[in-house]
Amino acid sequence: KNMHQILDLALPAYDELFEEINLDGLVESKGILYIWNEKDLKSRELEIQIRKELGVKQQIVNQKEIHDLEPNIKRFYHGGVYYSYARHARNPKKILLKLFELFLKKGGNFIKQKIKNVEFDDEKPILKSDNESFFFDKIVITCGAFSKRFTDNLNEKIPLDTERGYHVHFKNCDHLLNRPVIFSNRGFGITPMEQGLRVVGTVEFGGLNNPLTKSRIKNLIDNAKYMLGDLPEHEDEWLGFRPTLPDFLPVMGPSKNYKNIFYCFGHHHLGWTLGPISGKI
């Protein structure tokens, strides 16, 4: 509910960026479908009502309507919600590379360095790497789950943690779904992409350094087959770090301790969604 205002700005911010790049089929506007296996809406009434009060366009769908939208899903479901206006990326990496090229074209400068800490000279921030120092008038710390190392260094006590989320791909299977589908009861989703079907899900508080938990990969594979039946051998096992705070709100704005340092991190499950509007900081 508290994220509604910034989420309302997400698609217009993307549209503004997309006016300047050739998407070439990299984004599809086919909506997103959430499904569940409860036989009534009682457990879903609160979230549906809150979205209704906020003016979110949502369509409650029954078994037949779900089957019409996604005929390849096994019929374990009893209902769901369809957000027809939603979009999804067919290849996020290609989109990011196009935006990166636009950044350089507009005069942006990219320097690849491993930054160790932030220091100051006459109240101006200095980014320190092993071998170099970079001087700025202002900086924005946007390092996702890795931002805490810098905020701790700046004596800014921010309770940032990481929700580890897992991913697997099933190659050449994207034709099985028309749009992203989230199975709410089991906490996972599947998106049709250029690389095939991307299956994502779970939340694991495992920090930034612990190894991948194999049982969670197996859980994703089992859930994908529960939804779609037989699938080929999976590939590309990996996990990502969702930067999250206890109140589930991102940190966006100036530091309390330093007038020329700004923060923009902690977008939990919505980093890709809120990237363009957050970038306006």
Predicted regions and their residues:
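Active-site substrate-recognition segment that forms the wall
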Residues: 1, 117-120, 124, 133-260
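Helical element adjacent to the flavin cofactor pocket in flavoenzyme catalytic cores
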Residues: 42-54, 76-138
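C-terminal lid/capping helical subdomain adjacent to the catalytic/cofactor pocket in oxidative enzymes
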Residues: 5-6, 29, 60, 73, ...
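Mid-domain beta-loop-alpha active-site segment that forms a flexible
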Residues: 86-101, 145-146, 216-223, 278
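Surface-exposed helix-capping loop/turn segments at secondary-structure junctions
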Residues: 16-28, 105-109, 156, 228-233
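Rossmann-like flavin
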Residues: 1-95
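General small-molecule cofactor/ligand-binding pocket signal
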Residues: 59-61, 109-111, 235
